[in-house]
């Protein structure tokens, strides 16, 4: 089995830039070697009723969370050389691209 990282974003509202949490599982040699879950202060920072109904997160949960660039700086080194997979890859990749663009960050290959 190949090594990989599975990633899942949740958003605060209908904008892909509004990531409010990220979950990652890193698999190497067929075994889970790391699990990461971080709350993120979304941009724009407001929640819709329907997104909260999906994931249960609210403004209060993320009001003191780090912005995406700080969270990504911690996570990025752990993902080096690993392909990313996602259950709903068009959504999750769209979120990843959107927040990189929003913050003027270079999108990872």
Annotate each language-model stretch with its function.
Residues 1-109:
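Conserved non-catalytic scaffold segment of RNase H-like nuclease domains
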């Amino acid at each position: 089995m190949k090594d990989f990282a599975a990633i899942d974003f949740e958003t605060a509202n209908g904008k892909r830039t509004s990531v409010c949490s990220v979950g990652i599982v890193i698999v190497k040699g067929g075994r889970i070697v790391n699990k990461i879950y971080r709350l993120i202060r979304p941009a724009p920072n407001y929640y819709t009723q329907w997104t909260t109904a999906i994931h249960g997160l609210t403004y209060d949960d993320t009001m003191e969370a780090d912005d995406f660039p700080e969270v990504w700086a911690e996570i990025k080194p752990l993902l080096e050389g690993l392909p990313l997979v996602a259950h709903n890859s068009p959504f999750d990749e769209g979120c990843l691209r959107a927040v990189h663009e929003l913050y003027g960050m270079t999108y990872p290959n």
